[in-house]
Design a protein with these regions (language model features):
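A generic structural motif
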Residues: 12, 143-144, 199
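A short small-residue
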Residues: 41-47, 136-141, 274-279
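Short helix-capping/linker segments at secondary-structure and domain boundaries
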Residues: 101-105, 137-144, 237-245
C-alpha cells in the first residue's frame, strides 16, 4: 500500500534549541515511519530577514546537518533545497497573477509587520504565494503545522481551489496536520524558549554549556518543586520516575538541576556526536541533498508542465 505524502519546510535561521526539537523536529523523525516525506530547506523564505552570504550558507548547511543528526533518514525522507528547484518561484508568480492584494493583506506575517511599523518588503507581502507553491508542487496529503501556522495551509488550499476553478482540476487540496500534542518548551526564565529571549538551551550544546544553562534556570525559593526545572526535565525522563526523584529531593534545587544536566547530556550527546561525524564529511552530506534535489525536481517539473499546459503557455 502506498504511503501518504507529507511535506514541510524548515527556514535556515540558525542553530536549533531543545524547544525547536520537541516542538517540531522530533515529529518529522517520528512521522517518517508512516509517511513518504518531503522536507525542504526554505532558503528563499529566509531571504526576507537574512541578507548576508556567509550567514545564509552556514545556516543552510546547518539545517542539513541538524536533521541528519536527529535521525532523518534520506531513504524515507526527501530532503531538498527550495532555491535549487526553480519551479517554486515560477509557480509562485503564476499564483500571484490570480491573487488580490486585499487577500494577501490578511496574512499573519503581513499584519504583524504592520503592527510593528516595519518597512514591509514585497517578499514578506508575497510569501503566502511562494508557500502555496512550495506545498502544491508535491501534492502532499498532509502538511504538519502548529495551530498558529494553520493559515499557511489555508492559503495553499484557497489558491489551489481558485486555480482549479479558473484553469481546470490541477491541484489536490492538502490537509493541515495540526500538531496539538507537541511540547511547548519553557525557557530558563519560564517564558517560552526562544533565542530572542536568550533563555534557550542549544540542541547540540556541549556538556559545559548544558551545565551553565541549566544552572541558570530561574527558580522560586518558595517552591518545593521548581516548576521551571521540572517542566524541562519531563522531556528527558519518564514522569513517574521524575515524581519520585523530585519528592525525594524536594527543595534541593542544585541536586535536581544536576540530575537534569545528566539526563539532558545522555539525550543530547549521541545526536551531538552524530552531527560532528556528518560535519567531518560535508561533501557526503551535500550528496544527500543533491540526491533529494534530483527527486524533488522530477516531481516539481512534472507538475509545472501540467500547470503550463493548463494556462496555455506551452505552445511549442
Amino acid at each position: 500500500m502506498l504511503k501518504k505524502v507529507l511535506l514541510s519546510g524548515v527556514k535556515p535561521t540558525g542553530a536549533p534549541h531543545i524547544g525547536n526539537y520537541f516542538g517540531a523536529m522530533k515529529q518529522f523523525v517520528d512521522l517518517q515511519k508512516e509517511y513518504q516525506g518531503y522536507v525542504f530547506i526554505a532558503d528563499y523564505h529566509a531571504l526576507n530577514f537574512i541578507q548576508d552570504k556567509k550567514e545564509m550558507e552556514k545556516n543552510i548547511l546547518g539545517v542539513l546537518l541538524d536533521y541528519l543528526a536527529i535521525g532523518l533518514d534520506p531513504e524515507k525522507i526527501t530532503m531538498f533545497k527550495q532555491s535549487d528547484i526553480s519551479e517554486h518561484t515560477e509557480l509562485a508568480w503564476i499564483f500571484d497573477t490570480i491573487t488580490t492584494m486585499p487577500y494577501l493583506k490578511r496574512a499573519h506575517a503581513f499584519k504583524d509587520a504592520e503592527v510593528k511599523n516595519k518597512e514591509i518588503c514585497v517578499g514578506t507581502f508575497n510569501y503566502p504565494m511562494l508557500m502555496a507553491a512550495d506545498i502544491l508542487l508535491y501534492s502532499p496529503d498532509v502538511v504538519p503545522v502548529g495551530l498558529d501556522q494553520k493559515q499557511h495551509v489555508e492559503y495553499a488550499r484557497d489558491t489551489a481551489e481558485k486555480f482549479n476553478r479558473i484553469f481546470g482540476e490541477t491541484f489536490e487540496l492538502p490537509e493541515p496536520m495540526i500538531m496539538k500534542e507537541v511540547a511547548v518548551v519553557p525557557g530558563t526564565d519560564g517564558r517560552k524558549m526562544s533565542k530572542s529571549y536568550n533563555n534557550h538551551i542549544p540542541l547540540f550544546a556541549e556538556y559545559e554549556e548544558i551545565k551553565k544553562r541549566v544552572m541558570g534556570i530561574v527558580t522560586d525559593s518558595g517552591e518545593g518543586i521548581p516548576k521551571n526545572v521540572y517542566a524541562i526535565h519531563k522531556l528527558f525522563r519518564n514522569e513517574d520516575e521524575l515524581k519520585k526523584i523530585y519528592k525525594e529531593k524536594e527543595g534541593k534545587y542544585k541536586e535536581l538541576k544536576e540530575t537534569l544536566i545528566e539526563d539532558m547530556e545522555k539525550f543530547i550527546a549521541p545526536m551531538r556526536e552524530k552531527r560532528k561525524e556528518f560535519a567531518k564529511d560535508i561533501p557526503k552530506a551535500l550528496e544527500i541533498l543533491k540526491a533529494g534535489n534530483k527527486r524533488a525536481k522530477e516531481i516539481a517539473s512534472k507538475k509545472m508542465k501540467e500547470v503550463k499546459d493548463k494556462i496555455g503557455v506551452n505552445i511549442n
